[in-house]
């Protein structure tokens, strides 16, 4: 597989074209950002940890019948993925109240949400990824009703699979975001799943083991990511 020019440079990943029109290479960098890119730092080992963590999770989801864009690891920091036509909507599933939900509704952090909630946000850094609803998605043509229904079904299936995985590792899956795209017309899970895009707390102590350690200045960010990976059995 020949790696060609950079197509896109995000806050923490770079996307490269290949000699296969249906495949891309994702490069996980050490860049760590918060507050829509207003704060950026370099954290040693982060790119490699997130690349391998993502590969582990995506393979678990594939095994559970959820189609993902992940194909294979290429190096410590690179993986081969399917080229998707991305839908500009983030799907967020919440099992416990945290983050923007707490700020938006004024509820106490850590309250269990039964059933889990499903939320939609427009992917737009300039606007701060605003909260939207299903009517917006349909009215602006970001996805069809059928595509949105499939995204919602997959989101809850991901929650079901990963809740057990993390629970067995002594962790609470507080919330997470997913992005989807189309591969030859079919809805496929894209982007990544790592501690950058979910909240994970230790089940006993409620210690934060995710990117909130960076956002809130708690320190030991990569050490927490590596501890989560170790508990799950991710080969680093």
Curated annotation (Swiss-Prot):
Example GO biological process: 'de novo' IMP biosynthetic process
Pfam families, sorted: SAICAR_synt
Extent of the signal sequence: none
Residues forming coiled coils: none
Keyword entries, A-Z: ATP-binding, Ligase, Nucleotide-binding, Purine biosynthesis
Protein's recorded name: Phosphoribosylaminoimidazole-succinocarboxamide synthase
Annotated Gene Ontology cellular component terms: cytosol
Similarity annotation: Belongs to the SAICAR synthetase family.
Pathway membership: Purine metabolism; IMP biosynthesis via de novo pathway; 5-amino-1-(5-phospho-D-ribosyl)imidazole-4-carboxamide from 5-amino-1-(5-phospho-D-ribosyl)imidazole-4-carboxylate: step 1/2
Gene3D superfamilies the UniProt entry points to: ATP-grasp fold, B domain, Phosphorylase Kinase, domain 1
InterPro entries: SAICAR_synt/ADE2_N, SAICAR_synt_PurC, SAICAR_synth, SAICAR_synthetase, SAICAR_synthetase_CS
One term of GO molecular function: phosphoribosylaminoimidazolesuccinocarboxamide synthase activity
Gene: purC
Keyword ATP-binding appears in the UniProt entry: yes
Biological source species: Pseudomonas aeruginosa (strain ATCC 15692 / DSM 22644 / CIP 104116 / JCM 14847 / LMG 12228 / 1C / PRS 101 / PAO1)
Record-listed E.C. numbers: 6.3.2.6
Catalyses which reaction(s): 5-amino-1-(5-phospho-D-ribosyl)imidazole-4-carboxylate + L-aspartate + ATP = (2S)-2-[5-amino-1-(5-phospho-beta-D-ribosyl)imidazole-4-carboxamido]succinate + ADP + phosphate + 2 H(+)
Keyword Nucleotide-binding recorded: yes
């Amino acid at each position: 597989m020949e790696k060609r020019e950079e197509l896109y440079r995000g806050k923490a990943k770079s996307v490269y074209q290949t000699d296969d029109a249906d495949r891309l290479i994702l490069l996980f960098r050490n860049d760590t950002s918060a507050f829509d890119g207003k704060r950026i730092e370099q954290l040693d080992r982060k790119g490699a940890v997130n690349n391998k963590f993502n590969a582990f999770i995506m393979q678990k989801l594939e095994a559970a019948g959820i189609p993902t864009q992940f194909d294979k690891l290429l190096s410590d920091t690179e993986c081969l993925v399917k080229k998707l036509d991305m839908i500009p909507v983030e799907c967020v599933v919440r099992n416990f109240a945290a983050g923007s939900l707490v700020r938006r509704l004024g509820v106490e952090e850590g309250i269990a949400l039964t059933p889990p909630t499903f939320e939609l946000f427009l992917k737009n850094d300039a606007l701060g990824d605003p909260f939207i609803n299903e009517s917006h998605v349909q009215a602006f043509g970001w996805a069809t009703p059928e595509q949105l229904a499939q995204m919602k079904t997959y989101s809850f299936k991901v929650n079901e699979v990963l809740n057990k995985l993390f629970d067995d590792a002594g962790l609470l899956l507080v919330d997470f975001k997913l992005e989807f795209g189309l591969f030859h017309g079919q809805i496929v899970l894209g982007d990544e799943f790592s501690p950058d895009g979910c909240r994970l707390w230790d089940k006993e102590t409620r210690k934060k083991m995710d990117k909130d350690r960076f956002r809130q200045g708690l320190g030991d960010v990569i050490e927490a990511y590596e501890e989560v990976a170790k508990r799950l059995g991710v080969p680093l």
